[in-house]
């Protein structure tokens, strides 16, 4: 563990003694609830499983979500949320103490009865205490759950969704069947309906990703020529309309994949043309999604689309597409997984983990989730 991490852990354990875990006053029948998860897109999507479980238990409670600007699209139109609290830059990389205190002020103004902290940062764990929230339940990673009244230890290997749901179970609330969700708006569905070619099934490919505020992880990207071969086979062997998606900065990569696939009539480059809401609507209509470990991968799983995800430095047992009907393709060498808490082995130049996954490995996974 780096020296900085060790220092943070020791300081967190000392400060935790100032706020021992306890039993605050009973929750009201319809509590005011805040879910705190500032970043990032995939993690925020996974946290929607908590929203589903809370809403099922408290049908008329007020549930708000504190999220950063980068990840806001993941929950912007969620029907089970009353409103969103803007975290600004807090939780998305570098931010000032003034910004952190301003977020505490916003949380205090909500007069919440309960806050679920789905973040490993001690700064996030401390926020609801500073804001005067009596019930504070959240993750306690290496003793960093400062000021939480109920601490859920991060121990062993567990999928991130199940870890978040453990915070709900710490309240005595059942979580069976809860999963991440995304609800495209009617306007997004209508626009996408007019963009999809008729007469063929739709397959979506996302060859980019690995980017979050303050982090770019190119090792998560499966090579473009292999995505091109998958696109070609989907168009020719499965007679699918293949749509390549990504952000505005991914258009060149998407065009490379389309060109290498042979620039077939049924392979389309839509990178940079869709909002997150519209991407969800497109994925909702797709027969299959193929992509890297990205927010788009979690979005595909959240709308119920059979998902094939290619993994390298990160661990699909923790971050893979959640639920039945999906496949994560991972052939880890002895050094994998090296991605941990937003960091990876930057000295790695060979990317053996992602290179080990062959076209045939991915094609077999596609055949499993989308039988011919």
Which residue ranges define each predicted feature?
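Catalytic machinery of carbohydrate-active enzymes
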Residues: 1-372
């Amino acid at each position: 563990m780096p020296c900085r991490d060790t220092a943070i852990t020791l300081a967190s354990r000392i400060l935790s003694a100032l706020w021992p875990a306890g039993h605050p006053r009973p929750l009201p029948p319809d509590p005011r609830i805040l879910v705190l998860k500032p970043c990032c897109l995939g993690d925020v999507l996974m946290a929607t499983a908590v929203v589903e479980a809370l809403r099922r238990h408290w049908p008329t409670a007020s549930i708000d979500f504190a999220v950063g600007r980068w990840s806001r699209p993941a929950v912007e139109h969620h029907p089970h949320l009353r409103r969103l609290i803007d975290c600004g830059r807090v939780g998305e990389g570098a931010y000032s103490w003034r910004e952190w205190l301003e977020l505490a002020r916003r949380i205090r103004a909500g007069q919440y009865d309960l806050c679920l902290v789905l973040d490993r940062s001690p700064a996030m764990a401390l926020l609801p205490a500073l804001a005067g929230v009596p019930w504070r339940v959240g993750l306690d990673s290496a003793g960093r759950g400062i000021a939480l009244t109920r601490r859920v230890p991060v121990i062993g290997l567990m999928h991130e969704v199940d870890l978040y749901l453990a915070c709900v179970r710490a309240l005595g609330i059942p979580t069976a069947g809860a999963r991440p969700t995304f609800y495209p708006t009617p306007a997004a569905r209508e626009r996408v309906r007019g963009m999809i070619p008729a007469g063929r099934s739709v397959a979506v490919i996302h060859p980019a990703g690995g980017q979050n505020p303050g982090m770019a992880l190119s090792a998560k990207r499966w090579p473009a020529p292999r995505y091109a071969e998958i696109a070609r086979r989907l168009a020719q062997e499965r007679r699918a309309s293949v749509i390549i998606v990504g952000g505005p900065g991914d258009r060149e990569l998407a065009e490379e994949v389309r060109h290498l696939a042979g620039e077939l009539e049924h392979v389309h480059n839509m990178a940079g043309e869709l909002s997150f809401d519209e991407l969800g609507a497109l994925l909702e209509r797709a027969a299959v999604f193929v992509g890297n470990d990205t927010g788009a991968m979690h979005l595909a799983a959240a709308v119920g689309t059979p998902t094939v995800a290619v993994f390298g430095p990160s661990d699909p047992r923790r971050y893979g597409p959640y639920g039945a009907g999906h496949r994560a393709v991972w052939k880890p060498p002895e050094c994998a997984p090296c991605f941990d808490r937003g960091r990876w082995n930057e000295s790695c130049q060979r990317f053996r983990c992602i290179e080990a996954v062959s076209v045939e490995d991915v094609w077999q996974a596609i055949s499993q989730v989308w039988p011919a």
